[in-house]
Amino acid sequence: WSIGEFNPDNLQTSCGMDFGFSIDPDSLTEVAIDKKHKKIYLKEHIYQNGLKSQELAKIVLDKVGQSLIIADSAEPRLIADLKHAGVNIKPVKKGTIESGITRMQDYHLIVSPESTNIAKELNNYIFSDKASKLYVDNYNHAIDGIRYNVIYHLDNPNAGKYFVQ
């Protein structure tokens, strides 16, 4: 991965979101996937603890408007609350952590300079047991949201495209 300008080619973007609350932060990352050049551009918008549903919805709408957000399916009530508040959000079928990370590793990640928490996570995300490919459940909040977005778009190649017949 490297630090660089976010989405210099004006690719279609969407967001990945992981939910937290007291100990873990809510994270929202804007993602642009360049399949041709095998690059994923990342821009951090939210990395904050303790947000209530209404506060989170307001910040999300202020930061990314109606951009599609792919989020952790483990929080259906929060997803429903955010949808009710006007957020364009969909749950993802997560699959394994390993499969999502493997998909991400097929691409060069480019992190915008202001995305310090993403950079910190990428520098510290490690295996707890390399043989079994288990990851330490730490430094993974933005990474999880990014992983949800990448899984959604790479497993649904027509996501976000419209066809006229």
Which sequence ranges carry the predicted segments?
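ATPase catalytic-site recognition across NTP-hydrolyzing enzymes
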Residues: 1-17
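Stable alpha-helical structural segments in soluble proteins, enriched in small hydrophobic residues
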Residues: 141-153
